[in-house]
Amino acid sequence: MATTHFDGTDTPTSGELPAVGDTLPDFTVVDTNLGEVSLSDLKGKKLVLNIFPSVDTGLCAESVRRFNAEAAGLDNTTVLCVSKDLPFALGRFCGAEGLDNVTAASAFRSTFGEDYGVVLEGSPLKGLLARSVIVADEDGKVIYTQLVDEIKTEPDYASAIKALG
């Protein structure tokens, strides 16, 4: 079990992020059109997983905006933004913001959070996903991970993008 922080208070997660060098566990999440997206659908491209608690918080919304801006300049890369928000909320947000360089998806009916070790086990956000970033190569091998130490801070965008090569 890993630990992040919420307002400086230790907040355990349901497990550990996949380690650098590991193959990503398969997953299925739901996109904003209620279609299923699985890891196998994304093979052959590099993958950035932007994982966060809820797009209805300012910092989470900013992470989706920032990765959308970064994704515009990335070749052969999918940026998948995953939370437990309902697909309708994610779609409304991305539509209102004009975010079309990322794919927003919901883990509301999957074991994504448990399989990736990112379900928050404590704090007022218990049950939501911990802010984290995972980058994988075209074969699904993990090349970068970050469990953000304080939920109320942004991920290290530059390091995640740099890991793509």
UniProtKB/Swiss-Prot annotation:
<keyword id="KW-0575">Peroxidase</keyword>
<feature type="domain" description="Thioredoxin">
    <location>
        <begin position="18"/>
        <end position="165"/>
    </location>
</feature>
<comment type="function">
    <text>Thiol-specific peroxidase that catalyzes the reduction of hydrogen peroxide and organic hydroperoxides to water and alcohols, respectively. Plays a role in cell protection against oxidative stress by detoxifying peroxides.</text>
</comment>
<dbReference type="GO" id="GO:0008379">
    <property type="term" value="F:thioredoxin peroxidase activity"/>
</dbReference>
<dbReference type="InterPro" id="IPR013740">
    <property type="entry name" value="Redoxin"/>
</dbReference>
<protein>
    <recommendedName>
        <fullName>Thiol peroxidase</fullName>
        <ecNumber>1.11.1.24</ecNumber>
    </recommendedName>
</protein>
<keyword id="KW-0560">Oxidoreductase</keyword>
<dbReference type="InterPro" id="IPR018219">
    <property type="entry name" value="Tpx_CS"/>
</dbReference>
<dbReference type="InterPro" id="IPR036249">
    <property type="entry name" value="Thioredoxin-like_sf"/>
</dbReference>
<comment type="subunit">
    <text>Homodimer.</text>
</comment>
<feature type="active site" description="Cysteine sulfenic acid (-SOH) intermediate">
    <location>
        <position position="60"/>
    </location>
</feature>
<feature type="disulfide bond" description="Redox-active">
    <location>
        <begin position="60"/>
        <end position="94"/>
    </location>
</feature>
<keyword id="KW-0676">Redox-active center</keyword>
<dbReference type="InterPro" id="IPR050455">
    <property type="entry name" value="Tpx_Peroxidase_subfamily"/>
</dbReference>
<comment type="similarity">
    <text>Belongs to the peroxiredoxin family. Tpx subfamily.</text>
</comment>
<dbReference type="InterPro" id="IPR002065">
    <property type="entry name" value="TPX"/>
</dbReference>
<dbReference type="InterPro" id="IPR013766">
    <property type="entry name" value="Thioredoxin_domain"/>
</dbReference>
<dbReference type="Pfam" id="PF08534">
    <property type="entry name" value="Redoxin"/>
</dbReference>
<keyword id="KW-0049">Antioxidant</keyword>
<keyword id="KW-1015">Disulfide bond</keyword>
